[in-house]
């Protein structure tokens, strides 16, 4: 069938109209405001990086300037500003589809996905940009992407030209010891962590596979998690500009931000199970228990504290309290003329490495029963609990006829004092517990007592303490460490 000229013209007109409609529709789906906001145009494939702004103070910030600086470089740049709750005063953010505010705290009237930051990120890469940074040079994010792809590090970073630019650090995180240790980076600019202001870029899948991807302070939480996984960060020879109107410009604003930042950091470290931070130069920061708080663990069942089931050892703050209590108690006993010696697991720790066993939760000392009357605190404890001038609590233990010295009224980390007396050349006592090492022994192990380093001081110990320990625990006990109740949890089987 042949087409007439009229039919051919009609078909051509319909085809042309369809092409025009398709083109108009395509234009409508392009980013608005391609009104010469900046010198660069979006690549044909679209942006590969989402700018994520998390670290800022709601009461004083330069977030609008930060966001605008990235949009100047690329009007289609995806930007997510993340906050726990709606910032107040409100942020003056542009009302365009590629700039979004993510509220991370769950709310009754919002779906679960709304509080998950990954909901807002559709790009392969994420750039964590701190408040006070500004994008002035074109192509910085793309250069960071290329550096990440070309190198072996899982993160790359570019310092921000503020008063506190990023510096490279080594970081070792030991969950078992509840400790983070910072030091000089031996292979800078390849680092374990950064201290200071930097834009950090990584793959979105890596960021959102972390257990707390946007916990604040972002720098602290991010690098604790990445260093634990062995992910390096490469500090690049690129620099982001500082804000033209920097945040926290007044002394009051800086004071408020520092105060809230310290509280936020302490809460984060406690939540992540870090009780001690060690810095280069020997400075220590403690985030665990003290005399005014309770200890870090609850009642011990079956001689196996809860932290052992978590594949952790005694928190360092608890070990510090035990060392302090042991040193103090030994000083009181020596001043009063009470003969004492390291007992049980405490003697075992001293024999192994001169300290408390890393998973132990108390200190044991034996004393001569006949010397109890020499010590004012022990005499007082016979009648009831005594709090001395240093805040230590001396009391008779409820479990039996022995004494206990607690770190404080709040914190019940303690030293147990076991009164022994000689009978026919054998040391015995009136209270026995269901422990293998709780047995009688010949008095000749105490004649004489010998000095032995323990927990930062020198304590008295039985002579021939190896034989003494093997009598109580069995052969090879010094060389073969084991948890206190292997039937419940074995050191070799705990992972």
Curated annotation (Swiss-Prot):
Residues 289-318 are annotated as: Zinc finger loop. It is found in: Golgi apparatus membrane; Secreted; Cell membrane, Sarcolemma; Rough endoplasmic reticulum. Its cofactor is Mg(2+). Changing residue 114 to G: In MDDGB5; uncertain significance. Its main location: Golgi. Changing residue 362 to A: Decrease in ribitol-5-phosphate transferase activity. Does not affect protein expression. Loss of ribitol-5-phosphate transferase activity. It is a single-pass type II membrane protein. One of its GO terms (biological process) is protein processing. Expressed in the retina (at protein level). Expressed predominantly in skeletal muscle, placenta, and heart and relatively weakly in brain, lung, liver, kidney, and pancreas. It is an enzyme of class 2 (transferase). GO terms for molecular function: dystroglycan binding; identical protein binding; laminin binding; metal ion binding; phosphotransferase activity, for other substituted phosphate groups. It catalyses: 3-O-[Rib-ol-P-3-beta-D-GalNAc-(1->3)-beta-D-GlcNAc-(1->4)-(O-6-P-alpha-D-Man)]-Thr-[protein] + CDP-L-ribitol = 3-O-[Rib-ol-P-Rib-ol-P-3-beta-D-GalNAc-(1->3)-beta-D-GlcNAc-(1->4)-(O-6-P-alpha-D-Man)]-Thr-[protein] + CMP + H(+). Mg(2+) binds at residues 360, 362, 364. Pathway: Protein modification; protein glycosylation. N-glycosylated. Disulfide bonds join 168-191. The keyword Cell membrane applies. Keywords: Cardiomyopathy, Cell membrane, Congenital muscular dystrophy, Cytoplasm, Disease variant, Disulfide bond, Dystroglycanopathy, Endoplasmic reticulum, Glycoprotein, Golgi apparatus, Limb-girdle muscular dystrophy, Lissencephaly, Magnesium, Membrane, Metal-binding, Secreted, Signal-anchor, Transferase, Transmembrane, Transmembrane helix, Zinc. Residues 30-495 are lumenal. Pfam families: FKRP_N, LicD. Zn(2+) binds at residues 289, 296, 317-318. The chain crosses the membrane at residues 7-29. GO terms for cellular component: cytosol; extracellular space; Golgi apparatus; Golgi membrane; nucleoplasm; rough endoplasmic reticulum; sarcolemma; skeletal muscle myofibril. Changing residue 416 to A: Does not affect protein expression. Loss of ribitol-5-phosphate transferase activity. Belongs to the LicD transferase family. This is Ribitol 5-phosphate transferase FKRP. It comes from Homo sapiens. The lineage of its organism: Eukaryota, Metazoa, Chordata, Craniata, Vertebrata. The gene is FKRP.
């Amino acid at each position: 069938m042949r087409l007439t000229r009229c039919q051919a013209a009609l078909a051509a007109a319909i085809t042309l109209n369809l092409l025009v409609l398709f083109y108009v529709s395509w234009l409508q789906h392009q980013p608005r405001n391609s009104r010469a906001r900046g010198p660069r145009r979006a690549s044909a494939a679209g942006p590969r990086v989402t700018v994520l702004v998390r670290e800022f103070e709601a009461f004083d910030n330069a977030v609008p300037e930060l966001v605008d600086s990235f949009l100047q470089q690329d009007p289609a740049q995806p930007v997510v500003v993340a906050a726990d709750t709606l910032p107040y005063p409100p942020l003056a953010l542009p009302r365009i589809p590629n700039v979004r505010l993510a509220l991370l705290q769950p709310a009754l009237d919002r779906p679960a996905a709304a509080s998950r930051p990954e909901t807002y990120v559709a790009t392969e890469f994420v750039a964590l940009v701190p408040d006070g940074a500004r994008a002035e040079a074109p192509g910085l994010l793309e250069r960071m992407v290329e550096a990440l792809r070309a190198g072996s590090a899982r993160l790359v970073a570019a310092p921000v030209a503020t008063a506190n630019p990023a510096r490279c650090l080594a970081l070792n995180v030991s969950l078992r010891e509840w400790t983070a240790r910072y030091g000089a980076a031996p292979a800078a600019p390849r680092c374990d962590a950064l201290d200071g202001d930097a834009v950090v870029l990584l793959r979105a899948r890596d960021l959102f596979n972390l257990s707390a991807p946007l916990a604040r302070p972002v720098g602290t939480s991010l690098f604790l998690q990445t260093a634990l996984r062995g992910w390096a960060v490469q500090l690049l020879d690129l620099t982001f500009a500082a804000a033209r109107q920097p945040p926290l410009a007044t002394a009051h604003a800086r004071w408020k931000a520092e105060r809230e930042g310290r509280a936020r950091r302490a809460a984060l470290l406690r939540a992540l199970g870090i009780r001690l931070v060690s810095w280069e130069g020997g400075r220590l920061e403690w985030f665990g228990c003290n005399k005014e708080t309770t200890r870090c663990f609850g009642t011990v069942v079956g001689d196996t504290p809860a932290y052992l089931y978590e594949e952790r050892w005694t928190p360092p703050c608890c070990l510090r309290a035990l060392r302090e209590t042991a040193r103090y108690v030994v000083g009181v006993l020596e001043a009063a003329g009470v003969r004492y010696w390291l007992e049980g697991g405490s003697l075992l720790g001293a024999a192994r490495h001169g300290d408390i066993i890393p998973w132990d939760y108390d200190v044991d000392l034996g004393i001569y029963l006949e010397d109890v009357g020499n010590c004012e605190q022990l005499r007082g404890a016979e009648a009831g609990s005594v709090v001395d001038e240093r805040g230590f609590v001396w009391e008779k233990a409820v479990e039996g006829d022995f004494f206990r010295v607690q770190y404080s009224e709040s914190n019940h980390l303690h030293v147990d004092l076991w009164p022994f007396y000689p009978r026919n050349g054998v040391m015995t006592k009136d209270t026995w517990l269901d422990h293998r090492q709780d047995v009688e022994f010949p008095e000749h192990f105490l004649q004489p007592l010998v000095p032995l380093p323990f927990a930062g001081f020198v304590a008295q110990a039985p002579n021939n303490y190896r034989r003494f320990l093997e009598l109580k625990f069995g052969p090879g006990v010094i060389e073969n460490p084991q948890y206190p109740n292997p039937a419940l949890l074995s050191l070799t089987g705990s992972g």
